[in-house]
Design a protein with these regions (language model features):
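Structured catalytic-domain cores with a bias toward divalent-metal coordination
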Residues: 1-215
Length: 215
């Protein structure tokens, strides 16, 4: 979903196809590979879509009141300082340091990266309407008619989290859902959960997982 991560996702898909993946599927099982759902970001090596939206924050319900991230509003100006003058940068560093001292590192990570819908020019902006990429993915999901299926697994490749060279299996389902227990049953105790605080990632707003759950 993040364009620049398409290189990693494409490599995984090619590896699967070139090493007998389709031929080795058990009877009654299908695998759907969705390639480059954010083609603009992939082509221009950017995280965001052509609308300058973080696709993995764009699955909020725009018919309802959007999720709020007050921490982001507090640090937005420090994250994107008005100039690169020494005094401005020092003040920005001081604001961020004060936020961390008051709320902790993990709270800062969530404030910065959890997603926000208040600053279109800011980091991790979730947009004000469904993007083309979101609508395209939702149309793919609807075409799969997945609800009658006995089991459905969704693997979404991301990069830049956790130890170097390690693929962390992250479950973003809310705690208590059957999906969380199922993920651990399938992939073992190495599965981490954002809501439980066991993941290198903090909880996120408006993730693509919501698009699957709505179907």
């Amino acid at each position: 979903v993040h364009g620049v991560e398409g290189f990693c996702g494409s490599a995984a898909q090619l590896d699967r196809l070139e090493n007998g993946g389709p031929q080795n599927l058990p009877e009654g099982m299908a695998a759907i590979l969705v390639h480059a759902i954010n083609p603009h970001g992939f082509a221009w090596q950017r995280r965001v879509t052509e609308e300058n939206v973080d696709l993995n924050r764009n699955f909020a319900d725009f018919a309802q009141k959007l999720p709020d991230n007050p921490g982001y509003r507090e640090i937005h100006d420090a994250l994107l300082p008005a100039s690169l003058d020494d005094a401005v940068l020092k003040n920005a560093d001081a604001v961020i340091a004060a936020y961390k001292a008051k709320h902790g590192e993990r709270a800062f990570q969530y404030a910065r990266g959890g997603g926000q819908y208040s600053h279109a020019d800011g980091f991790f902006y979730g947009g004000d309407a469904p993007t083309w990429s979101r609508k395209t993915l939702e149309s793919i999901i609807a075409g799969l008619d997945a609800r009658p299926r006995k089991h459905v697994a969704v693997i979404d490749f991301h990069t830049g989290l956790g130890p170097y060279g390690y693929g962390e299996p992250i479950c973003v389902h809310p705690l208590g859902l059957l999906a969380s227990a199922r993920a651990k049953a399938w992939w073992g105790e190495s599965v981490t959960e954002t809501d439980a605080g066991t993941s290198s990632s903090t909880p996120r707003l408006g993730t693509a997982e919501l698009g699957w759950r709505r179907q």
